[in-house]
Regions:
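N-terminal glycine-rich phosphate-binding loop for ADP-containing cofactors
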Residues: 5-10, 24, 76, 80-84, ...
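Short, structured segments at the rim of ligand-binding sites
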Residues: 109
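Small cofactor-carrier domains centered on a conserved lysine used for covalent cofactor attachment
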Residues: 130
Length: 710
């Protein structure tokens, strides 16, 4: 006989002697306060019901449970009883055995829920993990205490401090789950529960288990991982807190460890790093929302792409499409250039095979999706045509005339320009409404960011279709407006300019790189420039020189270095020296050039403190970001953060430049800019938006909310 109660976010059903509790809180069954309350209530009912001998907990929709509701972080709702950790204890203390039926992504509090149960059955497609460190926090509902007891210290440390999930097969090997479902998950879980009853197995509580290994061995293992984290996660607090909590599982009784975990979880949740990582999480999801474009806009299907230009960028773009299963026609003007482009793509794939990231068969399949051609006529059946040729307006004009002539009438026409005016390029065609910018970042097959440049006449369905395409080819798309450098590179310019000025005034390239890397960037500005190639920046600077005001401060250091043929790593020398490798070595030649420039300017070189270096680097880009918002070239300040997180290596645990400004306080940022303005002139004058927000004690985050309401 089956009875049920279907009200609320948890559905209660009796299937004979088995009580089935189904979490029903779409879209991902988070442990919101209503779910916790309902689960606790039905758990008590099932334990008091003499007809119920075992309990199965499952989830409706796409998964068992998506863990904590991130919207409850730092809100009173998170404290509503039972809190998640108390709920897991209630589950474990149940007198009747509980089986968790795991399917879909069962992460964070979802896995902790399953660990609170006595047994676990998983669907073969389930993914299981504790990703909290990726949000700047640690598991706070028993995960750091139960998982090491269940599967051993080494695998638990790996899972918890990395935040990476495992698949169901690996979970079975590790001992996280007891059975993989081969048919219907719920039926198999009920059958498993009946087997437990038949065997009189009873509840199996992880809290009573001992961690494998001696105390001395386990403490040594913890210490080994402490040292590793200093190298693998520099500056990140959450992995360190997580390891400390795991260490407590080794040296403390379960209840003590649980209390200590709760305290470490509280500390991590209140940290700037946690706030920054949560901001990044939501910012990425907001970036796909374009206020004036309806979510039900009819999209143009993109089943085939044409890429014009088989250079490094064009080849990388082609790889992005074929990696996602989209066939590509790769077009070049000469057979030699085409052959070189295909060879470069093959070489990239062979490297992936060599490193175990692809199989030979997968490489062959991806290469088979590329058709090479020297004729524009072959783009005729492509849904999107992306131009990726030399960054010169006359070259673009000629290419777009051909694209306009030979592409299909309803095709999307895109330019990969990083600096040129997309509005001008659109007018090279007879259908400017079909033209937009798709600014990929190099290497395009690796970098996640795609700036989607909306020109004045670009139609809404074109923008929406390319935003959807970005997701399909595993990119993070952000819509931006037309200006020199768009959003990311426009902000990069004042940042690099300040780096040059700091060098003229007293710092050395390695001083600036070290400060920026200590802040969290993987590479400082001078090392990045050497890696990218100084000739690229030099070409852009020469183009901009034509319109630069005569009274504007300008550093000729890049000119002088490039005039020596020093273009960075590829020539063995740039800002640094490279002796047969990639290690950047400070070079006396560069020091001489810098000292000569300081002398030429009659500057008395001085010791520049790290704080000043960091403020001049970051505040220059923040101020430019505020001007971009004023100009209407980005929809939200959080979109700017996403651009810098995915295109420029801004440290994720800082949230992005605009969110970092909010953390520092816009009043503090504005006051510092005023000081710099008095010292160095108008380029440092705070933007009107920044000053307005500072004067009203507001933030970029609050400004974003107001834009959404408009």
């Amino acid at each position: 006989m089956t009875t049920s109660k279907i009200n609320g976010p948890v559905v209660f059903k009796k299937n004979g002697e088995i009580a089935v509790l189904t979490i029903n809180n779409p879209p991902v069954n988070t442990l919101a306060k209503e779910v916790r309350i309902s689960l606790a209530s039905y758990l008590e009912s099932a334990n008091q019901d003499a007809d119920v001998l075992a309990i199965v907990i499952c989830g409706s929709g796409r998964n068992l449970c998506g863990g904590a509701d991130i919207r409850e972080f730092n809100t009173p709702d998170r404290e509503v009883q039972p809190m998640s950790r108390d709920l897991m204890n209630l589950l474990e203390e149940s007198k009747k055995p509980i089986v968790a039926a795991i399917h879909g992504p069962t992460l964070g509090g979802g896995l902790e829920l399953a660990l609170g149960c006595h047994y676990r059955v998983a669907d073969k497609l389930a993914s299981i993990g504790l990703p909290e460190v990726q949000r700047g926090v640690i598991p706070g509902a028993g995960g750091t205490q139960r998982l090491p007891r269940l599967i051993g210290l080494q695998p638990a440390i790996k899972m918890i401090t990395s935040g990476l999930p495992v698949d169901a097969i690996e979970a079975l090997k590790l001992g996280i789950v007891d059975l993989l479902s081969t048919n219907d998950l719920l039926e198999d879980s009920i059958a498993f529960a009946k087997q437990i009853i038949a065997n009189n197995s009873g509840p199996r509580r992880i809290s009573t288990m001992k961690i494998e290994g001696s105390l001395e061995e386990n403490i040594k293992l913890i210490e080994k991982h402490r040292l590793q984290l200093k190298k693998s996660a520099p500056g990140l607090s959450a992995p360190t807190y997580a390891l400390e909590s795991i260490n407590n599982a080794v040296i403390m009784a379960f209840d003590e460890g649980l209390k200590a975990e709760a305290e470490l979880s509280r500390i991590s949740m209140g940290s700037d790093q946690s706030r920054s990582l949560v901001h990044a999480f939501f910012a990425e999801r907001q970036a796909g929302k374009i206020p004036d474009i309806s979510s039900d806009t009819i999209l143009r299907p993109i089943k085939k792409a044409a890429i014009i230009g088989a250079g490094t960028m064009g080849g990388g773009i082609a790889m992005s499409f074929v990696n996602a299963g989209v066939p590509v026609i790769l077009i070049e003007t000469s057979r030699e250039n085409l052959a070189n482009g295909i060879s470069r793509i093959e070489s990239n794939y062979k490297t992936s095979v060599k490193r175990g990231r692809l199989t030979e068969e997968e490489m062959a399949i991806r290469l088979s999706r590329i058709t090479a051609s020297t004729s524009y006529k072959d783009m005729g059946d492509s849904d999107i045509v992306i131009e990726a040729v030399y960054e010169e307006i006359d070259v673009k004009r000629n290419v777009f005339k051909e694209i306009d002539r030979f592409s299909r009438g309803d095709a999307i026409l895109a330019t990969n320009t990083s600096t040129l005016d997309v509005n001008k390029i659109a007018l090279f065609t007879n259908r400017p409404e079909s033209v937009l910018g798709t600014h990929f970042f190099s290497p395009a097959n690796v970098m996640k960011l795609l700036e989607i440049v909306r020109a004045d006449r670009t139609s809404k369905d074109i923008v929406a279709s390319v935003m959807a395409m970005a997701k399909e080819i595993n990119k993070v798309g952000v819509v931006v407006g037309v200006c020199d450098g768009f959003v990311g590179n426009r902000m990069l310019a004042p940042y690099f300019r300040q780096c040059d000025f700091l060098v003229e005034e007293g710092a050395m390239p390695q001083d600036i790189d070290n400060v920026v890397e200590e802040y969290g960037f993987r590479m400082g500005p001078f090392r990045v420039s050497d890696l990218a190639g100084l000739d690229i920046s030099w070409a852009i600077e020469k183009r901009r020189a034509e319109t630069r005001p005569l009274d504007e401060r300008f550093s000729p250091l890049l000119d002088r270095i490039c005039q020596l043929g020093r273009y960075g790593q590829k020539t063995g020398a740039g800002w640094y020296l490279y002796e047969g490798g990639r290690k950047a070595i400070p070079d006396p030649v560069i020091e001489e050039i810098i000292y000569a420039r300081s002398h030429e300017m009659s500057l008395n070189r001085r010791i520049i403190e790290d704080d000043e270096i960091l403020q001049r680097c970051l505040y220059s880009m923040i101020n430019e970001g505020a001007k971009i918002l004023e100009d209407g070239l980005a929809i939200r300040s959080s979109d700017i953060d996403v651009i810098w997180l995915h295109g420029y290596g801004f440290p994720r645990h800082r949230g992005g430049p605009m969110f970092y400004a909010d953390l520092v306080g816009l009043r503090n940022v504005c006051d510092t800019l005023d000081e710099f303005h008095r010292e160095w002139g108008d380029k440092w004058q705070p933007s009107g938006l920044l000053r307005s927000l500072a004067d009203s004690d507001s933030s970029f985050g609050e400004w974003d909310k107001k834009q959404i309401k408009k």
